[in-house]
Structure formats: C-alpha cells, structure tokens
Amino acid sequence: MVDMKLAQQKGFSFGNATKFMDFADPRAMIKDAATLDPNATVPAYMRTYANPRVIEVLTAERAYRKIAPEVKNGDFTTAFTQFRSIEFTGNTTPYGDYDGNGVSGVNTAFPVREQYRFQTTVKVGDLEQKMNAEAKIDLFAEKQKSAAINIDIAFNKYALYGVAGKAVYGLLNDPSLNAAITPIVVNSTHTVWAEKTANQQMDDLNKLVASLYTQAAGHIDDSTKTKLLVSPATLAAMNKVNDYGVTMKKMVADTYPNLTVVVVPELYNATLETSTMILLADEILGQPTVEFGYADKYYAHEIVRDLSSWKQKVSAGTYGAIVQLPFAIGSMTGI
C-alpha cells in the first residue's frame, strides 16, 4: 500500500482523502449499492479514499523519465524557481616559494524557470456510474486514471518542448544548448541512416561523440555514463549489419560500454522524414546535466456535486527541462 505522506512529498495531493483504496481487497471497497444510488451529496468514499493507480501511471516509465531524474520544486503556489549552475575554472603554475600564481574559482549562474500549471477534469453522471457498477467497474476511479495518463502525456511534452511564451523550455529547444551538427554525407546526398550502412552509421555516432567530448573540454570521456537518445526509426536502422555480420547496436555496445540507448519518438520529423539524435552525460562531478522540474504531479481539487453528476478538476505544474550543464549535451540532426 502506498504511503499517503510520502505521496504528498512527491507531489501527489488528493484533497481530503486520508487513505488509498485497496483494489485488491474487496472489503476495502465501498458496497455497490452505496455507489449507485443518486443523492444530494458526493459519496463519502470519493472523499475518503485516494486512487493509487494515478501514482502508478505518473511514475511508470515514459521517455522523459528515462532521460533524466524528476525534481520537485516548490508547490502549487510557486510562480518561479531558480536553480544553481556551477562551472569550475582555474589553472596551475610551477611551484615557487614566493610565487602566488595560479588560481581556482567558479562561475555561477542562477537561471530562472517559470511554473506552468495545466489541468483536466473528470466528470461522472449518476446513470453512467450506476450502469458501469453493474459490470463491476468503478467508473470514477477509471476516469481518474485517465486523467493521470493525460497529465503524464502533457508532462512528457513539456519536458521535451517546453511551453511557448513562457520561461519553460524543453530538452529539444532549450536556448542554452549548442547548435546541432550534421551527419556525414555519403553518395553525394544520403544522410539518413536508413540509407547508410552500419559502418557509416557508426561514423556519424563517432562524429557526435567527438564533438561532445571536445566541447566538454575533458569533462566527458569513454568512462562517463552517457545516454544516446534516438527515434524509433533510428533504433530500427541500428539493426543493420556490416560485412562481418555485426549490427550497429553491437558496435555501439562494444565501443561505448557506458552508453545507454533511450528511444524518444519525438526525435523523428515526419515532415522531413529524418531524425535527430542527442548524446548527453548523466552528470559531471556530481552535478546532473539536466533535470525535469515539477511542482505538483497530480493535484486533485474538491469533488463538486451537480444536479445528477459529479466532477473534479485535476491539475499539475511543470518547469520543463532544467538544463544545468549545456556543454554536456550534443545533438546531430538529419539522420
């Protein structure tokens, strides 16, 4: 059973609910008759029990959660969040008894991100609730789960693209990132991996790796844990084999053992029929390269009784992608 206090600390708010519904234990569920009969008030079980399935949805694996960790910043009332970015600087000189040369310092920055609040609603009619209950379906709980799914889809979108017109940026369009490099052209025109051999694909990846290592100025090498973000089309192209029967995937695993491939469907451009791939370090000197900030994962507002129905607003708040180390992210577009 999920702990209510821990859930609140992680950004899940269920209003006046004091416990989670145990769907595995019929004794914990309200009797059908009590959920079916229309009355002037909201059924007590809706206020007393929280639906644990929304937590399952909002913590399950989704593309952005495989890329970087999520971090809670503030709460529903927080308008802006400020995070700290530190770059280490300095140099050394030959030792001398009376020499004070050489200095070590830091460059600090405090970027600000705005909270974007978004919402959806759950509505249940008396008749539809009664009809679904005949089939042993808790319609209100299922619609809450649907709300959680829609919220999670939105979180994924904002983590990658941000929100237009606000200081909320995504991993794919953060203004602090370096411009994407281009793949190697083969046969005069081909850049897309579907038209390249496994070895030619590997050449493109090596080019991206070299570019990232160079801009990181020695902070990233083969021992650094990294992630390669690719589209489904790119992942499929990586199954090509070279003249020795070795796939691109196998070559990547052998050459870069600390690299993890993550599939991100949004990296495919259907209009151009090309993909982008992103290479990033998980962290540098203990500082994460990127985090996905949120204020509330699931904020359940009061359930409101109407003439013959109930409704509930569910909201959440995001700061998008908080890129702390732009130099630790590189990309290549047109593959």
How should each PLM-predicted stretch be described?
Residues 120-204:
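Alpha-helical scaffold segments that mediate packing/assembly in large oligomeric complexes
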Residues 151, 155-158, 205-216, 252, ...:
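Hydrophobic, Leu/Ile/Phe/Ala-enriched alpha-helical segments that form helix-helix packing faces
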Residues 165-166, 177-178, 233-237, 268, ...:
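Short, catalytically relevant binding-site loops at active-site mouths
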Residues 172-245:
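Extended, solvent-exposed, turn-rich assembly/linker loops in the middle of proteins
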Residues 1-65, 239-335:
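Sequence/fold signature of self-assembling virion shell proteins
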Residues 123-127, 231-233, 325:
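Helix N-cap / beta->alpha transition motif
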Residues 33, 37, 45, 49, ...:
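Alpha-helix boundary/N-cap detector
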Residues 40-120:
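Assembly/oligomerization interface modules of large self-assembling protein complexes
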